[in-house]
Amino acid sequence: MTNMRKTHPLMKIINNSFIDLPAPSNISSWWNFGSLLGICLVLQIITGMFLAMHYTSDTMTAFSSVTHICRDVNYGWLIRYLHANGASMFFICLFMHVGRGLYYGSYMFTETWNIGVLLLFAVMATAFMGYVLPWGQMSFWGATVITNLLSAIPYIGTDLVEWIWGGFSVDKATLTRFFAFHFILPFIIAALAGVHLLFLHETGSNNPSGLSSDTDKIPFHPYYTIKDILGALILILIISLLVLFSPDLLGDPDNYTPANPLNTPPHIKPEWYFLFAYAILRSIPNKLGGVLALVLSILVLALLPLLHTSKQRSMMFRPLSQCLFWLLAADLLTLTWIGGQPVEHPFIIIGQVASVLYFFLILIIMPLASIMENNMLKW
């Protein structure tokens, strides 16, 4: 009798993706984040669906419907905070996943990498629109500031902003459409993640050495299924601690005040995971320049395959590139800190230096360091 998992049309897909998939024998815990992102996405879709059952996307009732979820719905507070902190965990896993790809040269799988960049944009758009939904002060003013950036686009900018707003300011129409987009985008993200995996399985996984692992493969199950389960348990532990002990740790107190178009909060800032991009946006005095820098701060990732000048794929055996990588990581942490600070001395200049360093490192210093390493090895 033939094995059903190897013959059944549906089971065969699952089998070839998660059971009999040949995987490199030496992939480290940095390869766990893909599965963790999948878990985060499922968690967000499930909690989001339950929240949508009780939420109303109307400016008059949105804030009170969220209060109602937290106070009156059975375990509503838990669902709401799982969803809010699940987004933070999602971005932590995303940053780790992208960082792993940058360090070990995974961007050389160009199709997989470019779909990953597209996924990053989609997740950022979804998170931004989700932050608007509770209709607190920071929701309203965040939506106003960020959508207003599109007015920097020459000629069509103003019309485009009013088209997105559905009027002359962020109002009922904006909230309703943001809710619609926030609901549909995660399913598009799930489909894109499927395509991401499809392209990954065309080439097989990369590994820490950056060398071909064709000579030494092991089956995904049980080796990496058990490893992914350990990662999942750690993720669940962290998110449980966050949700049950300090659910508002990563939030903004301003968002507990209902949206008021007549009162601007002293410091408008997005959620922590956007602060690095927000700092880059603010560090350029020109509006259009700032918007371009904001988009390029993520889009620059798509250029990495073109900027790879080293004859080795991974940074594992390249100490100079390793130092620059961790300098880039420290720079991003600096930008995140600056993004949450008021626009005053010395934060302005720190933000500008960190922003210039960010692009300078990726576009110029790292490719040059790779060429130097090639020469040092007399390649």
Swiss-Prot record:
GO cellular component entries: mitochondrial inner membrane; respiratory chain complex III
Assigned keywords, A-Z: Electron transport, Heme, Iron, Membrane, Metal-binding, Mitochondrion, Mitochondrion inner membrane, Respiratory chain, Transmembrane, Transmembrane helix, Transport, Ubiquinone
Biological process (GO), any one: mitochondrial electron transport, ubiquinol to cytochrome c
Binding site for heme b b562: 83, 182
Function of the molecule: Component of the ubiquinol-cytochrome c reductase complex (complex III or cytochrome b-c1 complex) that is part of the mitochondrial respiratory chain. The b-c1 complex mediates electron transfer from ubiquinol to cytochrome c. Contributes to the generation of a proton gradient across the mitochondrial membrane that is then used for ATP synthesis.
Subunit relationships: The cytochrome bc1 complex contains 11 subunits: 3 respiratory subunits (MT-CYB, CYC1 and UQCRFS1), 2 core proteins (UQCRC1 and UQCRC2) and 6 low-molecular weight proteins (UQCRH/QCR6, UQCRB/QCR7, UQCRQ/QCR8, UQCR10/QCR9, UQCR11/QCR10 and a cleavage product of UQCRFS1). This cytochrome bc1 complex then forms a dimer.
Protein name stated in the entry: Cytochrome b
Organism annotation: Galemys pyrenaicus (Iberian desman)
